[in-house]
Each structure stands twice: as C-alpha cells, then as structure tokens.
A protein has these predicted regions:
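C-terminal catalytic histidine-bearing segment of alpha/beta-hydrolase fold enzymes
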Residues: 187-242
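Short alpha-helix in the alpha/beta-hydrolase fold that links the catalytic acid
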Residues: 48, 175-186
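Short beta-strand/loop motif that positions the catalytic acidic residue
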Residues: 159, 165-167
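A conserved short beta-strand
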Residues: 137-147
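Acidic catalytic loop of the alpha/beta-hydrolase fold
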Residues: 170-174
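Serine-hydrolase catalytic machinery in alpha/beta-hydrolase-like enzymes
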Residues: 5-111, 206-214
Length: 242
C-alpha cells in the first residue's frame, strides 16, 4: 500500500494530504476522499485511509488546516476546527480543494475512473456533508459520528450524493435534535439519505482512544457494524444500486 504525501493549494495556505492506493492492483478504480477527525492528518487518519483503500479504492486523506499545522491536544484541535464549523463557506472551500486535488493527482497516475465518494469522521463527517451540500459530484457521502449542523442548509436538488450518517443515540455532541433537523433539511432538499443510530453508543465510537465519560468512547460492535455498512453503501453507490 502506498501513501504519497502531496502538498496542494488551499487558498492562501499550502495543505498536505496523502494519496493512498494499492500499487499491486491494476486498472482504474473509484476515488474516495477521507476527511479525518479534528486531530487532522495523523497516523490514525492514514490507517483509516489504508483500510478504505484495501477495498480497491484510491483514497485521499484531506488536510483542513494546512501543512505543518497539527494539533497536539483537544484544546488545539477545537481552536482550529470550531471556526471552520462556524464558517460553512470556508469549510466547503477547504474540503473542495482536497476533493479537486484527489481527482487531479489520481488522474495523473492513471488510477481512477469517474466514480467518487467521500467518508468523514467527527469533524470530517461534517466536512463531507458540507461538500455534498455544495453539490459536489459524489456517488456517496458517509458521515460517521460527524457534525450535522450547518449555517447553510442544502438547497432543493443540490445534493447529488446518496448520504449515510451513523451516530450513537446518547451522543451529546450530535443530539437527537440535530439528527431531526438534518432529516428535515435533507427531506426538504430532496436528498437520498440513510441514518443509523446505535443505542448506548457515545461520540467518536470508532476511535479506540476515545475515553471521555458521558461524552465519547470506543465501541467495538458499533465500529465493526459501521465499517460493514460503509463498505456496502459505497459498493452499492458505485454500482448505481442506491
């Protein structure tokens, strides 16, 4: 498995993402943008990208902060992520830069066909939903315990992607009110969506290191089921079965 570090322009900032693919696989493949949690371009993000790439996809791990800007704790992560959460236009601009870089770099290597998707975790889940709201040419967008709130709700007919969102029922970061608002938003926009909610599961449940009592915690069963659902959802989207 290769992970090519790639610097790319993101407005006035230079970002650094990673293009991940199995160079032992021949033929063109779908491309999947992966938006990591608010800790950004970590080893964990690369490992998640490799997990997705193992399904015969080309994966690009997005950098939402800029090369060399890597939070070392939750406080620094919040200081970087929260202004973007409040600014949907800037958030969309940054995730779109990663999306366009993925396509350009993968095409240069003759790796991809014309099928695209995006998967995001936590903060990254919100990133990919903003990309979908912006009308990106996506077969699918998957948000895993991600941000559902937006300052710019989807416009009627704008969302091209089929959407899958997965959450823990008692997750205080994305409470039921946010899930209900997201459902209403996407119904009004005419989007195709699915939502999976796990009882007793907190925020960041796919992260083994998550351990904040009452807020975040790893859940092995929900993680396994979410990855299986994501795998099937992407396969169905790429085969036009959704």
């Amino acid at each position: 498995m290769r992970a090519d570090r790639i610097k790319y322009p993101m407005g006035a900032v230079t970002a650094e993402g990673a293009l991940i693919y199995d160079d032992n696989v021949s033929g063109k493949r779908p491309a999947v943008l992966l938006a990591p949690n608010w800790m950004g371009m970590t080893d964990n993000a690369i490992q998640r990208g490799e997990l997705v790439a193992a399904n015969r996809y080309v994966v690009f791990v997005a950098d939402m902060y800029g090369a060399g800007t890597r939070p070392v704790d939750f406080g620094e992560a919040a200081a970087l992520a929260n202004p973007l959460r409040a600014d949907a236009i800037e958030q969309r601009r940054r995730i779109k830069a990663a999306f366009e870089t993925m396509i350009a770099q993968a095409k240069t290597r003759n790796l991809i066909d014309d099928r695209r998707a995006a998967v995001g975790f936590c903060f990254g889940g919100g990133n990919v939903l903003e990309l979908a709201r912006d009308g990106a040419d996506l077969a699918a967008a998957v948000s895993i315990h991600g941000d559902l709130k937006t300052a710019r709700p989807a416009e009627q007919g704008r969302v091209k992607a089929a959407l899958l969102v997965a959450h823990g029922a008692p997750d205080p970061v994305t409470p039921k009110a946010d899930r209900d608002a997201f459902e209403a938003e996407m119904n009004a926009a005419g989007a195709k969506w699915q939502m999976v909610v796990f009882s007793g599961v907190l925020h960041a449940y796919t992260d083994r290191g998550a351990d904040v009592p009452g807020i975040a915690g790893w859940d092995e069963a929900a993680t396994r089921q979410t990855y299986a659902l994501t795998h099937q959802f992407l396969a169905d989207a790429f085969a036009a079965r959704l």
